[in-house]
Amino acid sequence: MHVISLIVKNEFGVMQRVMGEFTRNKINVETIVVGKCEVPKRSRMVLSVIDKDAAETAMGRLRKLQDVYDAELIPSEGQSAYALISTSNGNVGLVGGAAQVEEIIERSQSEKYVMALNAL
């Protein structure tokens, strides 16, 4: 998985413009996490894609957007995964490396789960 971290304007319409670049280039986003960050009036947007060439294409396009202040491709050692899975005992939160979290989800045979990658 290839993870892109962006610092963007924290205002309406920015996510649509960012995702428009993925749509125009027919790049599927596997996970997306967005939230306030350390920079006032900015948000961090973290997206993951499967294909490295697609990630590099997206990076080139995203850097041209006025709403994007910083864009970087995060190496695997800078990534972490988290998930929420539904079990017979209730919901369970998981945090760890992507492969580790995916393995736990698979072993749990949970009918419902959500997983995302994050990075700084």
Map each language-model feature to its residues:
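Long, contiguous binding/interaction regions
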Residues: M1-R42, I50-L120
